[in-house]
Amino acid sequence: MSSYKYYDLIRRPVITEKTTLLSEQNKYTFYVDKLAEKLAVKKAIEEIFKVKVKKVNILNVKGKKKRFKGVIGRQVDRKKAVVTLEKDHNIDFAGGIK
């Protein structure tokens, strides 16, 4: 698989208070493509960030119902991947921020 497909597979990192606490345990969370599988996510993370992945957990997140100007709508469904890295590896999302 080419590196372009890896970048299409991993949408963006999920940066919240909960995921920040998980990163201390070497667990990082990403939104991934709806058709992504564990093995493909593992290969993509290893190729993009040059780290060693220990385990991948996949979650399907259902979209919430929302109201906008009196019209009831729904957010899109998403897929999240929680990636556990090996002990000596980490990902620095805020590397250039000072």
Swiss-Prot record:
GO terms for molecular function: rRNA binding; structural constituent of ribosome. InterPro entries: Nucleotide-bd_a/b_plait_sf, Ribosomal_uL23-like, Ribosomal_uL23/eL15/eS24_sf. The keyword tRNA processing does not apply. Keywords: Ribonucleoprotein, Ribosomal protein, RNA-binding, rRNA-binding. GO terms for cellular component: ribonucleoprotein complex; ribosome. It comes from the Bacteria. Coiled coil: none annotated. Pfam families: Ribosomal_L23. SUPFAM superfamilies: Ribosomal proteins S24e, L23 and L15e (SSF54189). One of its GO terms (biological process) is translation. One of the early assembly proteins it binds 23S rRNA. One of the proteins that surrounds the polypeptide exit tunnel on the outside of the ribosome. Forms the main docking site for trigger factor binding to the ribosome. Belongs to the universal ribosomal protein uL23 family. HAMAP family: Ribosomal_uL23_B (MF_01369_B). This is Large ribosomal subunit protein uL23. It comes from Rickettsia bellii (strain OSU 85-389).
